[in-house]
Regions:
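Core segments of transmembrane alpha-helices
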Residues: 52-64, 115-116
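Physicochemical signature of membrane-embedded alpha-helices that form the seven-helix bundle of GPCRs
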Residues: 9-12, 80-83, 107-110, 114
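Cytosolic, membrane-interface loops and tails of multi-pass inner-membrane proteins
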Residues: 22-48
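Interfacial loop-to-transmembrane junctions
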Residues: 90-117
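Juxtamembrane boundary at the C-terminal end of a transmembrane helix
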Residues: 120-130
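Transmembrane alpha-helical segments that form the membrane-embedded catalytic/substrate-channel core
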Residues: 12-29, 85-94
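Mid-chain, well-packed structural core segment of small domains
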Residues: 60-61, 67-97
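Alpha-helical transmembrane segments
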Residues: 3-19, 68
Length: 130
């Protein structure tokens, strides 16, 4: 069984993670910081954005894969995953603390709602109620 939605979203996650890493690397290079944050607030914010992404994204992808494997994905699953990914980009930008700071809140809420919603669906699928 080809998990088209899961594969597409995993590819998107890899690109976003790469982008978040590049953003950290840009600050490291410009400030000549090799290890740690060097007390640089922007680097700390960007590192937290990437770490937050890698803390949450595996759960979302596992839930999506499980739902898709169970044959319960349907047309709704890809847009939910895409919304999550957009929220994570907004969070990454918002973590810089600039005019885009609202993106952090948007990304946080999107992440929480996506995880909770997918977890509920997974339980419904697992118990045969969906």
């Amino acid at each position: 069984m080809l998990l088209t939605t899961t594969l597409s979203l995993t590819a998107a996650a890899a690109v976003i993670n790469f982008w978040l890493a590049i953003r950290c690397g840009q600050v490291r290079a410009s400030q000549k910081i090799s290890i740690g944050t060097g007390g640089n607030d922007l680097l700390e914010r960007r590192m937290r954005a990437q770490l937050n992404f890698v803390e949450n994204t595996p759960w979302v992808l596992l839930l999506i894969a499980g739902i898709e494997l169970a044959g319960k994905g349907g047309a709704w699953l890809a847009p939910v995953g895409a919304t999550y990914m957009i929220g994570r980009v907004a969070h990454g930008l918002g973590m810089d603390g600039t005019a885009l700071e609202k993106g952090r809140s948007i990304g946080t809420v999107t992440t929480m709602l996506t995880q909770l919603g997918l977890a509920v669906v997974a339980v419904l699928v697992a118990t045969g109620r969906m």
